[in-house]
């Protein structure tokens, strides 16, 4: 959530910064509410000061010998009581305006970092680096073709069980998925991340705190009889691990590696990636999450990105890193580095991780602060996929496919799978 003080004091500057995202932003309604709130605040403060003055005058008169039940003191007390009633009315009006102001603020995205590349769409993203040599050969299969041939998952029966965009992993496919999850968690925890397995059902406050609500309600699955939603990413529950808390500065950064199933309606993606593991309603992901000191979030962003890259390097999967432009970063992000893995069968780079620094945007929505001495300030939050498991499996299958129909696994996965290859069953 944006800082209401900044919005109130510098609305034009805020509108300009939000406009860098590629869409004009009208802050008129927000300004009107903020001005009304400021006016009420000043009026209330003035009345409270007058009430305090009258209270002191009553005390002085009684101390000077005036009759506590006399007419003069009674008149002053009557004035004081009238002021208290006015203050109570103003406080209620302020609460109402504060609710309106917060509802408005929750609809605005984060301000892009000054270092975020300017751009109008994804074509303006800036490639920073590449790792590995992409495999480029004629006749390579896409991952879903390999999976069907090796019977790694069953989509037809999954439609019967649920609907389209679901898969049931079978045999070697289920084992490979489990191996990837365990490998990712082991790698991250070896680097000091604390493993977390959070609830997959979260309440509205959690989704609001991380930035999914109110804007992305249509892309989430909701339990209609309860205030619960299926989490679209472990970022949501992990953000709320420390909601309404003050974290001592000497405990920062807090670094979590969270595995969870993720659920998304994928509204607006009709017709895209209809086969395989790339775009599903339910998928597994290992999420990296940092609560960092505000002075060190830039270094934390570089590190969380490197930690996500380490998974791809260990699995010998070529990839590239993109610095997303202002029009392509997510709602809660200040700046985002996307990792795109090479899929030899599809002959394309595909997103497998987004590593974002969110500044104090989520922390303000979730009231997560840190204390250093007597000073209390909002923490900074960062998140990144480490990695999306299904897309990682797709890359492993396409990269390791052999002419005999088998799939040669990365050496790092062999101890987890228990075999060097996936063979036709």
Curated annotation (Swiss-Prot):
Tell me the residue numbers annotated for binding ATP: 264-266, 351-354
Q: What are the recorded GO MF terms, alphabetically?
A: ATP binding; serine-tRNA ligase activity
Biological process annotations from GO:
selenocysteine biosynthetic process; seryl-tRNA aminoacylation
Source domain of life = Bacteria
Enzyme Commission number(s) of this protein = 6.1.1.11
Enzyme class, broadest EC rank: ligase
Q: Where does it reside?
A: Cytoplasm
Pfam families cross-referenced by the UniProt entry: Seryl_tRNA_N, tRNA-synt_2b
Q: Which UniProt keyword terms apply here?
A: Aminoacyl-tRNA synthetase, ATP-binding, Cytoplasm, Ligase, Nucleotide-binding, Protein biosynthesis
Q: Where does L-serine bind?
A: 233-235, 287, 385
SUPFAM superfamilies referenced in this protein's UniProt entry, alphabetically: Class II aaRS and biotin synthetases, tRNA-binding arm
- Pathway stated in the Swiss-Prot or TrEMBL entry: Aminoacyl-tRNA biosynthesis; selenocysteinyl-tRNA(Sec) biosynthesis; L-seryl-tRNA(Sec) from L-serine and tRNA(Sec): step 1/1
PROSITE patterns tied to this protein: AA_TRNA_LIGASE_II
A GO cellular-component term linked to this record: cytoplasm
Q: What is its main location?
A: cytoplasm
Give the reaction(s) catalysed.
tRNA(Ser) + L-serine + ATP = L-seryl-tRNA(Ser) + AMP + diphosphate + H(+); tRNA(Sec) + L-serine + ATP = L-seryl-tRNA(Sec) + AMP + diphosphate + H(+)
**HAMAP family on file:** Ser_tRNA_synth_type1
Assigned protein family: Belongs to the class-II aminoacyl-tRNA synthetase family. Type-1 seryl-tRNA synthetase subfamily.
Can you quote the domain comment?
Consists of two distinct domains, a catalytic core and a N-terminal extension that is involved in tRNA binding.
Q: How does it assemble?
A: Homodimer. The tRNA molecule binds across the dimer.
* Stated role: Catalyzes the attachment of serine to tRNA(Ser). Is also able to aminoacylate tRNA(Sec) with serine, to form the misacylated tRNA L-seryl-tRNA(Sec), which will be further converted into selenocysteinyl-tRNA(Sec).
What name goes with this protein?
A: Serine--tRNA ligase
């Amino acid at each position: 959530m944006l800082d209401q003080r900044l919005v109130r004091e510098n609305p034009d500057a805020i509108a300009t910064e939000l406009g860098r995202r590629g869409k004009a932003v009208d802050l008129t309604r927000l300004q009107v509410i903020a001005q009304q709130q400021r006016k009420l605040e000043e009026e209330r403060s003035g009345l409270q000061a007058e009430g305090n003055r009258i209270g002191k005058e009553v005390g002085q008169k009684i101390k000077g010998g005036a009759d506590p039940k006399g007419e003069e003191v009674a008149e002053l007390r009557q004035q004081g009581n009238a002021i208290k009633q006015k203050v109570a009315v103003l406080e209620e009006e302020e609460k109402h305006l504060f609710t309106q102001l917060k509802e408005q603020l929750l609809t605005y995205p984060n301000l892009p970092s000054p270092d975020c590349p300017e751009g109008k769409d994804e074509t303006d993203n800036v490639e920073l680096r590449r790792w590995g040599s992409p495999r480029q050969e004629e006749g390579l299969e896409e991952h879903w073709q390999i999976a069907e041939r090796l019977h790694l998952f069953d989509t037809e029966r999954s439609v019967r069980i649920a609907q389209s965009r679901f898969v049931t992993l079978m045999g070697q496919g289920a084992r490979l998925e489990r191996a990837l999850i365990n490998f990712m968690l082991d790698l991250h925890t070896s680097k000091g991340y604390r493993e977390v397995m959070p609830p997959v059902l979260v309440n509205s406050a959690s989704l609001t705190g991380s930035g999914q609500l109110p804007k992305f309600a249509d892309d989430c699955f909701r339990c209609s009889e309860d205030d619960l939603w299926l989490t679209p990413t472990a970022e949501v529950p992990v953000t709320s691990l420390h909601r309404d808390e003050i974290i001592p500065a000497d405990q920062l950064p807090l670094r979590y590696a969270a595995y969870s199933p993720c659920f998304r309606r994928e509204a607006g993606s009709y017709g895209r990636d209809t086969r395989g593991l790339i775009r599903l309603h339910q998928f597994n992901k290992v999420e990296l999450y940092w609560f960092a000191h505000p002075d060190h979030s830039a270094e934390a962003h570089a590190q969380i990105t490197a930690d996500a890259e380490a998974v791809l390097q260990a699995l010998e999967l070529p990839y590239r890193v993109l610095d997303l432009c202002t029009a392509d970063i997510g709602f809660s992000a200040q700046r985002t580095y996307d990792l795109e893995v090479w899929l030899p069968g599809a002959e394309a780079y595909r997103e497998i991780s987004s590593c974002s620094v969110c500044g104090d945007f989520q922390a303000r929505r979730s009231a997560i602060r840190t204390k250093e001495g007597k000073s209390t300030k909002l923490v900074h939050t960062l998140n990144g996929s480490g990695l999306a498991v299904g897309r990682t499996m797709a890359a492993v299958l396409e990269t390791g496919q052999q002419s005999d129909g088998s799939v040669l696994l990365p050496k790092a996965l062999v101890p987890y799978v228990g075999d060097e290859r996936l063979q036709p069953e």
